[in-house]
Structure formats: C-alpha cells, structure tokens
Amino acid sequence: MEHDNAESIRLHLWADLAYQGKLLRFIENHDEPRAANTFSPQKQRAFALTAATLPGAKLFHEGQFEGRKVRLPVFLDRRPHEAIDHELPVFYTKLLEAINRPVFREGEWSLCERTGWPDNPSFLNLVAWSWRKDDERYLIVVNLSDFEFVSRGPILPAEAGI
C-alpha cells in the first residue's frame, strides 16, 4: 500500500473472491520497514482498517499495535526502549473487537463503486466495500490520501442488498 494509490488497490480488489479469500493481509512484517516509520498515524489506521476488513487471513506484526519503529533483527533477544503511541493500542483494540463479529468471517463481501463530480476528483482516493450476513451490514469507506474528499457516496452493488 505504500506505493499504490486508491485506484490500483481498488483494481486489485476486483480479483475473484475465491482468490481474495486466500490472500494474507498485513501492513508490516519482519523484513520491511515498520508501519510507524512509513505511514502517518492517520494512514497507519486507514491501512490497518483496510487490511483487517478485507477477505483473507490477517497478520499483525509484533509491536504494530504500539507503533514500534525499531525493526529488530531476528536473533536479538531484547528490545530497545521506545516511546509508544498510546492511542494506537486503543484503536487496535476497537478494530479487533469489530472484526471479531461473524459477519467479517462468514458474511458476503462486496466491492463498492464510488462516485463524485467531474470537477472534483477527490472521490478517486476512496476505496469502499461492504460485508453482509443476515440483517447485519457494514459499509467500510477508506480515504487513502492525505486530503479530505467529496463524494456522492458509494453506489453499492445490487447484490449487496444495502
């Protein structure tokens, strides 16, 4: 997500749902820079929400919930002292509670279209999808830019029933 824009991510999400369900979703791992060093706090949260609410397995890296910035070598047995982003664990606690609902594992996922006005392309920075199971429905809209957006709202696919 570091080098992709919302449109390239949205196009990736058009892939077959069976394929999407086999993917591993994460924003950091042991051999890449830490998310806290790569993204602004707002983008960290947007990308975490994205990775956590898409189909597929979710992976969270040690220290991600605290906003750790030091990438530890595999063989280091102790961690240096780091300042912690005290708001980030609260965010992740709420996110994990939300995605623990059965709808995010057993429900029907749909990619949503988004629309705007010809003279304001800021809606192109959005990616939107929905989850549905029985009467439970969730619409996730993520702004993947550093700027505010104007949108007429996602146009949901008919099969989403929302």
Positions of predicted regions on the chain:
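Hydrophobic, well-ordered secondary-structure elements that form the walls
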Residues: 30, 51, 95, 141-143
